[in-house]
Each structure stands twice: as structure tokens, then as C-alpha cells.
């Protein structure tokens, strides 16, 4: 949470309990998570501020040693590494992962996809899920930072590369070891900063990739929203490809019932001596004049060179999409019922 210099901090809370056997749900205040607004309707309370002392520090180090015995290939390996979590002060935090071992991560859900579009899988590795919210800039089927790219299958063995297909088809590993990952964040009351980097180890057929990201976010006012800037850089030496992405994002609230948000981005991709520039933007506006009515409008544009998949995720580019959504709800005292929903979404290619 941002620093609060006063002795009292204001927060909003809710308490809920669900009894599955009776299909009953209790909450105070009476809110249902699937109905908007939810978070903004929490009950406000005042608590003693825990962060009055700005010199509070903590340092945690979790080392590990693991061994692997491959009976099929008759080889053995021992891995040594660890993770460091350093709360420098109430605003700053440094996280470091050295030669991480993610063997405890649960597997992904099985999703059957017969389309030509990539399926997005959220990252479940602890280091890449904790304290990562500052770097999140997203859109419709789009994320500028997708940490699943880090430690993924080596470039030389990917489906898009044919130089080692004969050798790689017998390659038993679908991941790349990570040498180090570092994340630094500083979250003040007005300004927030973040730096992120991860360096991969070399594999049998490929050199490791290098990932870098920088983030700045500024609170315009307690009610007026935020503006921010994100930059990412990826070096993929095995396929002679470099990616440089710039993103400017905004979230503005003209009033308590309206919101205007989105981003503008430029992608610079250099591959084998050729450079391509791509552009994209997203603008969305929502309005809730009353509890019964909600409207949402958006436009997305991604040109044919707006490929951010080196470090991010985009389901499809070379298109423009326009959408409108209306929700009308009737809210009696004891229950709520949805009267009508009207949704229109049109997607067109940018090149005919």
C-alpha cells in the first residue's frame, strides 16, 4: 500500500462466508462478487497506520538445493540457488531469484484450441506472480508483459524456427533455465517506479534470452486517476531478433460515475538486419449514472507490425475492433435480477 504519514489509515473491507452444502452466501455489507460495483462498495473503516515508521526493513533469504537423476539418459545434476526478498523501507522492495527451481508449480489447465491463435496461460511461478501488479498494462486479449515467455522453450527449438528441427524433435525439455531474475519497485503516494530483468541460461541449441522492463506511474489526484509509461526490451540472439516496446497508459475519472482509460503503444522489432515499426492503441469509456444502468464503449487498433509477443501476449494483431456494452439491472430489496444486456463487438482487419 502507498505510504500514509498520518496515524490513522482509511481502508475498505468486506466479510463473506459461503456454505456450500446449503448453497447459502452471507456478506457484510450485502455484496455479490459477480455484480458491479463490488470493490468500491466495501465498508470504509479506520485503522491504526502500521507504516508510520518509514525506516522499517526486513530481509529474507530462502536457499535451496535440489538433485535430479535421469535414469533414461543416465545423467545426474545438482542445482543450487535461492530467492531474496528485501523490504528496503515502507515504499521500496527488491526481489531477486538466483537459478530458480520451479518444480513445485502446479500444471496448467487443459484447453483445447483448434484455432491459429495462441492460448494465454497465466504464470503460476511464485516469483513472477508476487509484487508484479505495477508492471501490468493490459488490453483485450493483450498483455505487454507475459512472464510465461521467460524460461520458455528455446528459440532454436520453437515451432517457428526450422534450423534445428531435426535435432530438436528429440529434445526432451520444453523450458529454459533462468540464471537470475531481479525486480525492484518503489510505491510512493504520488509516484511509483519499477525495474525488472531476467537473464536465461544457454541451452543445448540456443543462447539464452535477456528480458528488461521499466515502469513509471503517477497518481494525478486521489480521484482523478493515473498516467504511466512502460518500456520493455528483449534480446533473442539465437534468431537475431530484438524487441523494443514503448507504452503510455492513462486512467482518468472525470467524475465518480465515469471512467476514461487506455493506452498508446509503439513496437520496434529488429530481426536479421530488418526493422519494422508497429503501432496500437486502446481507448475505453465507462459510465454508471445509477446502480441500475452501466454502459461501456471501446475501440482497439493493432496494425500489421504490432507484434509484442517477444515479452508480451497478443492474441491477434492487424485488426481494429469496436465494442459497445449496456447493462440494465433491477435491484429489489432481497435479490437482484438482470433485465437486459445488449452487446455489440465488431472486429475488422486493418488491411483489406
Locations of regions flagged by a protein language model:
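Outer-membrane beta-barrel channel domains
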Residues: 1-48, 57-68, 74-336
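Acidic, proline/serine/threonine- and glycine-rich low-complexity intrinsically disordered segments
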Residues: 340-341
